Amino acid sequence: MLHRKSIKLALIFAGLAIIMCAPAALGQAIVSDTPFSGQPAMNTCNADAISVSGTLHTETTFSTNPNGFIHSSFNSTLKGTGVGLPSGANYVLNEIQHAEVNSKTVAQEQFFSTKMKLIAQGPYPNLTLRTTTHLVVNANGTVTVSTSGFQTSCN
């Protein structure tokens, strides 16, 4: 399982990526595929530590309308494989992240979600992780909605 700090960092990175790519991507999608290796993961269902290698696919969009409304979107799909220790099980990792930010001046709405499936080959348990965050800030800068969820399951 990816640690909560890793997930929070990924969400922060997603927000920063949206902001940094905004000028270059006005009204366009920026797509990239990035290979990775040695990314730590943990199957908390059986305490396997896994070193995952694979590819991260990202798509970022940014647009504004004449009224000054800004919409940013970040989607990523991570696909990887690894071997768990101490079990020796082969794993397939699939993770999807989605972030949306809608804003006008201080007022904004943010939504982030992640679903990660760590699939063990053989008799070992699979892990599913889901996280969500929803934040709404009104024009006065007051947070009117702030919810988050974190759920794991083994099967």
Annotated model-derived regions:
Residues 27-155:
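Beta-strand-enriched cores of mature, soluble protein domains
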Residues 2-12:
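Bacterial N-terminal signal peptides that target proteins for export
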Residues 10-21:
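Bacterial N-terminal signal peptides
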